[in-house]
């Protein structure tokens, strides 16, 4: 029975590692369709597939892409009305620059559709940077650490000032010469 418990983890490890190697082999040759080396003579016309993924256009119009998520919410769960989430892509050209306060982020438009009633609600709101809990927690933690550091620095300065008053530091006073101290005669007694 003990041997079975030792063999099962090794077999499981071998099975999982073999699966990841097979997955790595599939990912190795992603761009195999264009690997023949037969490119056009004019290299400027050829797109290598690397870069941002935005195709180059002849016109210089500024286009902004707005991503809108449409969610169909069902009032009661049933098999007749499945949950559907679709994403539509809209393009807008030459938007005027908006002035925003620093630290504010605008959220995306969301459209909610409920069942067959087709009630459409759109919501746009701005979010201040300090309303996010992780930013607020980081600011509070940084303030606490800074406060502790300041208290430690003040305590260190007070400690050094007290030690200086006690006389344990060399304050630049002259020490008496070694001639002032006389060596006591040493007498040796042998028994």
UniProtKB/Swiss-Prot annotation:
Major localisation: membrane
Keyword Transmembrane among UniProt keywords: yes
Glycan-modified residues: 36, 48, 50, 52
Signal sequence interval, chain numbering: 1-22
Transmembrane spans: 138-158
A cellular component annotation (GO) from this entry: membrane
Any one GO BP annotation for this protein: cell migration
Subcellular location: Membrane
Residues in compartment: Cytoplasmic: 159-191
Keywords: Glycoprotein, Heparan sulfate, Membrane, Proteoglycan, Signal, Transmembrane, Transmembrane helix
Pfam families in UniProt: Syndecan
Function: Cell surface proteoglycan.
Protein known as: Syndecan-2-A
Organism phylogeny: Eukaryota, Metazoa, Chordata, Craniata, Vertebrata
């Amino acid at each position: 029975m003990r041997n079975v418990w030792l063999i099962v983890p090794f077999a499981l490890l071998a099975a999982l590692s073999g699966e990841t190697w097979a997955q790595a082999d599939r990912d190795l040759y992603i761009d195999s369709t264009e690997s023949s080396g037969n490119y056009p003579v004019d290299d400027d016309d050829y797109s290598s597939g690397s870069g941002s993924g935005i195709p180059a256009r002849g016109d210089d119009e500024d286009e902004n892409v707005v991503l809108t998520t449409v969610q169909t919410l069902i009032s009661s769960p049933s098999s007749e009305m499945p949950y559907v989430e679709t994403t539509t892509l809209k393009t807008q050209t030459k938007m005027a620059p908006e002035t925003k306060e620093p630290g504010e982020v605008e959220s995306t438009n969301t459209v909610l559709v409920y069942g067959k009633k087709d009630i459409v609600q759109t919501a746009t709101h701005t979010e201040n940077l300090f309303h996010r809990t992780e930013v607020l927690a980081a600011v509070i933690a940084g303030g606490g650490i800074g406060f502790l550091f300041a208290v430690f620095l003040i305590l260190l300065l007070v400690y050094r000032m007290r030690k200086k008053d006690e006389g344990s530091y060399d304050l630049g006073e002259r020490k008496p010469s070694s001639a002032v101290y006389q060596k006591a005669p040493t007498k040796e007694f042998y028994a």
